[in-house]
Amino acid sequence: MEAERRHRALYKGTTPPWKETYRKRCVERLKSNRSKLLDKFRQVGERIHGGVGGSFLVQEVMEEEWKVMQFENGGFPSMWKKDAFSQDPDELATLEEIKQELLLEEKAMVEEFENILQFEEQCFDSVVELSTGDQIVCPVCNRNYLTVTSCFIVCQCGVYINTQSQGMSIEKLHSLLESNLTAHAYHCNKLPVFSVATELGGAASLFMSCQECDAMVVIL
């Protein structure tokens, strides 16, 4: 009770001095939990609405950040225990305002994730298009089927890559193409291109590159 009185005295008749600090901390925590939010979003698939109040992380973020401020300032009551937090209309309105801002921030992040997942599907489809049964279309020329053995990969367009040390197979090559396309799609919404380049030692390697984000990855 005494803690609550001290807490209310902090901002009686004025804008709560903790409001901006709490708001900024909540926004920063929400953004720092980006990967966690993406994992939660993946788990629910196409169901846009998450947990409490249609949110994935907002309630959790607000609770965690309030606990930090409560630890730093003994004048803050326990927000989430029954009858522990003040029912002052101004105080509740402040919290609701912060919550709505966080919900909008989370919504923007979810929309971004939707675009990422949609692009990942497009990339997966492009890999599927490269594969027909036990065959893979050459990602360099996009016309001919590759001949894949444990020792080499070859295409009529001129692609020849020695894979003797890697023990290559159709399944392994498909997995490499899919995983690299998916990883690229996480941070860029443009489809990359594939090429073969000869290194200093004379060995040929398969590269995946993107002009949009300047990414370049050695696939083989």
From Swiss-Prot:
Mediates the import of RPA complex into the nucleus, via its interaction with importin beta. It comes from Xenopus laevis. InterPro entries: RIP, RPA_interact_C_dom, RPA_interact_N_dom. Interacts directly with the RPA1 subunit of RPA complex. Interacts with importin beta, but not with importin alpha. Forms a complex with the RPA complex and importin beta, which is dissociated by Ran-GTP. GO terms for biological process: protein import into nucleus. It comes from the Eukaryota. It holds the Pfam family RPA_interact_C. Residues 1-45 are annotated as: Interaction with importin beta. Residues 49-165 are annotated as: Interaction with RPA1. The gene is rpain-b. GO terms for cellular component: nucleus; PML body. This is RPA-interacting protein B. The keyword Secreted does not apply. It is found in: Nucleus. Keywords: Metal-binding, Nucleus, Zinc, Zinc-finger. GO terms for molecular function: zinc ion binding. Signal peptide: none annotated. A zinc finger (RIP-type) spans 138-213. Disulfide bonds: none annotated. PANTHER family: RPA-INTERACTING PROTEIN (PTHR31742:SF1), RPA-INTERACTING PROTEIN RPAIN (PTHR31742).
